[in-house]
Amino acid sequence: MNEELQNQFMALDVYNQQVQKLQEELSNIDMMIMELLRSIESMEGLKSSKEILLPLGAGAFIKAEAQNPEKIILSVGVDVLLEKDVDEVIVDFQKSVKELEETKELVNTQIQKTNQEIVKLRSELEKRAAAIEQRNAQMRPKTN
């Protein structure tokens, strides 16, 4: 196999790895969006009921009542907490969801472009393989 052909096979492998990483990134983005949407839903729920489920760990919860549901305490860094109004946090989370959706679109576009390159490269490799096969067939001695 000549060097150019080897390079094309390596490029194909790299493209496939890129698509896989981008798909993993999409999955992570989806999980972040879902977490933000659940948080927004929970904060909206605090407006009608102060009752919350407090996680204890290992899938166990206890019913509790929020003392001050108008304020949310956010972790903004290592050992740094910030208190904000619930409506302000909801708006911030909605902005984050929108930004993540935009990022998701960019990642999907990149996946499409990379897949187009994969299709193009595979087509080239198939043509070359067919040409090599034809050349080899012509070089074989014919038997009667």
UniProtKB/Swiss-Prot annotation:
Known role: Molecular chaperone capable of stabilizing a range of proteins. Seems to fulfill an ATP-independent, HSP70-like function in archaeal de novo protein folding.
One annotated GO biological process: protein folding
GO cellular component: cytoplasm; prefoldin complex
Any Pfam family matching the protein: Prefoldin
Top-level taxon of origin: Archaea
Gene giving rise to this polypeptide: pfdA
Subcellular location: Cytoplasm
Matches recorded under InterPro entries: PFD_alpha_archaea, Prefoldin, Prefoldin_subunit_alpha
Gene3D superfamilies: 1.10.287.370
This protein's UniProt keywords: Chaperone, Cytoplasm
Species, as recorded: Methanococcus maripaludis (strain C6 / ATCC BAA-1332)
Subunit structure: Heterohexamer of two alpha and four beta subunits.
Keyword hit for Cytoplasm: yes
Major localization listed first in the record, in broad terms: cytoplasm
GO molecular function: unfolded protein binding
Protein name: Prefoldin subunit alpha
